[in-house]
């Protein structure tokens, strides 16, 4: 099984992914931001127009990792900003893929961003991505409004939906 946790910066993707991974006896967490950070010379920011080519390489790597872990019986949890079309593509590749979009309010996102070890530097990305996610129809990603959720509640909601989907 592959579980994709998507959302804007500060939506809780990493925290939710790590906590969710602990609910499975054999799981792996793939933070795509960490793969992006491996590129030192020639690193292109995700909001740069030229990022698409670099993302293809990053995607190629996290999909290879996904395949390898699946072959060894792991549940794979991927944390990235991923749209419905990508989830559909991954479903065709791996079959058993579930996508979740964490979509707290924009005010909550900005508050969380300031609480992180940052200066609110991702506010601009939040301003761009939030309307895209909030105003799109999602037929593959299941939307979770985690505005007033504790981490454990968001994880339980996802876990419950996964259990219901696998029957």
In which residue ranges do the predicted regions lie?
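Small-molecule kinase domains that catalyze NTP-dependent phosphoryl transfer to phosphate-bearing small molecules
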Residues: 115-157
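Glycine-rich phosphate-binding loop used to anchor ATP phosphates in small-molecule kinases
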Residues: 54-94, 98
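P-loop (Walker A) phosphate-binding loop of NTP-binding proteins
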Residues: 8
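Conserved substrate/cofactor phosphate-moiety recognition/catalytic segment
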Residues: 18-61
């Amino acid at each position: 099984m592959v579980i994709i946790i998507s959302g804007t910066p500060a939506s809780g993707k990493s925290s939710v992914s790590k906590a969710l991974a602990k609910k499975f006896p054999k799981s792996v967490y793939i933070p795509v931001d960490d793969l992006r950070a491996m590129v030192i010379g020639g690193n292109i920011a995700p909001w740069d127009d030229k990022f698409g080519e670099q993302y293809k390489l990053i995607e190629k790597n996290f999909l290879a990792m996904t395949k390898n872990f699946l072959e060894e019986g792991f549940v794979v949890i991927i944390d990235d900003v991923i749209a419905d079309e990508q989830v559909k593509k991954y479903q065709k590749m791996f079959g058993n893929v579930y996508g979740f979009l964490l979509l707290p309010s924009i005010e909550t996102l900005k508050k969380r961003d300031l609480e992180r070890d940052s200066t609110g530097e991702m506010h601009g990305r939040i301003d761009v991505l939030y309307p895209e996610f909030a105003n799109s129809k999602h037929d593959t990603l299941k939307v979770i409004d985690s505005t007033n959720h504790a981490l454990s509640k968001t994880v339980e909601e996802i876990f419950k939906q996964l259990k219901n989907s696998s029957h």
